[in-house]
Amino acid sequence: VIDPWDKSIIGEIRQGIFRDRFSKETVIDSILKIVSDETESVAFVVINDISRYWGVSNLFKYEELHSWDKLQRIMNILEDTNFLKNMMRKYSGSGVSLVIGEESGIKGLGECAMVFTQLPFWDTNNAHIGVIGSKRMDYAKSVPALREVQSSMRNVMKGWS
């Protein structure tokens, strides 16, 4: 039985990607906003040597992340493309990967989690999408949302290769 949330978000992701498929920038914006809103976390993409993110305000929904130190560490991660690329390389599998708490190797981020997957994206195989937020995030929403982005992008990219 498919959860009604799953049907709703899957449809929204598919429609957003299909609608915006002719513009890389618009697809990125659409994906980031949908994933961030639905997961209540910060959504990010890393494509080659560029990273972008959306939804920093979602971090304020989690009391355990209200410390300036934690927020600053998260912002530093999001703004450090090399760090993100290394994390993806180290922990990536064929599906959706989870890095929870201190597994990241970053002291003081025991309350955080990162969920990410590889993303087919036009002319590169070096792209990932993910979310970072509280380790209390709703993984039942985060994992399917990222799987659907990956699947929808793979389907859209079939026509481009």
Short names for language-model regions:
Residues 2-161:
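Intrinsically disordered, acidic Ser/Thr/Pro-rich low-complexity regulatory segments
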